[in-house]
Amino acid sequence: MTPDHTLDEFLDLVDENDNVVGKKKRSEVYAEHLSNFRVVNAFVVNSKGEIWIPRRAANKRIFPLCLDMSMGGHVESGENYEDTLKRETQEELNIDTDKAQVRLLGHLSPQKDGVSANMNVYEIKMD
């Protein structure tokens, strides 16, 4: 994260085809229970096929102490999924995605899949 980064960044709002149609602060998106924004999630998998699944911190507002994806983050306004994957993987895991094997597993949407946001899910292979 950059030093001036806040938890109230702007997120792009998207239509049912994942095209940007506007933007709102993250706090407004959650206060209004919107699902038309973008996120990325990734699973780190080693050469044995083992997945690293961390436990969320006790002080997390949503799902404290629950098991989670290896990495997850919001796509900030002006970013695309790949930019966010690179930024969040560096911030959360100190992994440079340019030096890892990354594969898109799929795209999920609130309309088709019942998830909380438009979501790209990735696999990051490394030991």
Model-derived segments and their meaning:
Residues 2-41, 45-47:
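Acidic, metal-coordinating catalytic segment for phosphate/diphosphate chemistry
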Residues 13-15, 32, 65, 69, ...:
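Generic structural "secondary-structure junction" signal
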Residues 38, 58, 90-127:
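Active-site segment of metal-dependent pyrophosphate-handling enzymes
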Residues 39-73:
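A glycine-rich, hydrophobic loop/mini-helix early in the fold
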Residues 52-53, 70-104:
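The catalytic Nudix box helix
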